[in-house]
Amino acid sequence: MLEEFKKFALRGNVVDLAVGVIIGAAFGAIVNSLVQDVIMPIIGAITGGLDFSNYYIPLSSKVQAGMPYAEAKKVGAVIGYGQFLTLAVNFTIIAFVLFMVIRAMNGLKSKEEAKPKPEAEVPADVKLLAEIRDLLAARREA
C-alpha cells in the first residue's frame, strides 16, 4: 500500500498539480496586495478618499451609521458590498492573468504543432529490400 501511494504521489500529474496550487496561492497573495494596496487606494483617491472596504448596507437597527465594517458585522447583519467590490476586482485580475498565460501557452503549442516534423531516416536494410523489390518487379515486366 505504501509503495502504491509512493507511485501515485510521485507521478508527474500529482507533482505538477501540487506546484500549481502552491504557485497559485502565492500569486493570489500578490494580486490581493496589488488590489488592496495599489488599485483600491488609487480608486479611493479618484473618488475623493473613499474606503471601499468599509462600504456596507446595514440590515439591523443595531448597526449605527459610520461604524467600520468589521464592527458593524459584529453588531448585526450587514451587506458588505465594498468588500465584495474589492474581491470582484481581485477575481477579475486573476482571471485576466490566467487567460493571458493560457493564451500564450496555446500560441506556443500551436507553433510547435505547425513545425514540419523531419521524416525519419530509412534504415539501410529497408532501402536494400526496396531496391531488390524494384529489380524483381522490373525483371517480371521484361
Swiss-Prot record:
Record organism: Methylorubrum populi (strain ATCC BAA-705 / NCIMB 13946 / BJ001)
Q: Where in the cell is it found?
A: Cell inner membrane
For this chain, one GO molecular function annotation is: mechanosensitive monoatomic ion channel activity
The record describes the protein's role as: Channel that opens in response to stretch forces in the membrane lipid bilayer. May participate in the regulation of osmotic pressure changes within the cell.
Give the multimer and partner information. Answer: Homopentamer.
Is Translocase tagged as a keyword?
no
Under InterPro entries, the record lists: Mechanosensitive_channel_CS, MS_channel, MSC/AndL, MscL_channel
Got a GO cellular component term for this one? plasma membrane
TM spans (from-to): 14-34, 38-58, 82-102
Q: What is its main location?
A: membrane
Put simply, this protein is called Large-conductance mechanosensitive channel
Name the keywords, alphabetized.
Answer: Cell inner membrane, Cell membrane, Ion channel, Ion transport, Membrane, Transmembrane, Transmembrane helix, Transport
Q: How does it sit in the membrane?
A: Multi-pass membrane protein
> To which protein family does this belong?
Belongs to the MscL family.
Q: Name one Pfam family in it.
A: MscL
Q: What's the source species' lineage? A: Bacteria, Pseudomonadati, Pseudomonadota, Alphaproteobacteria, Hyphomicrobiales
The UniProt entry, under HAMAP family, shows:
MscL
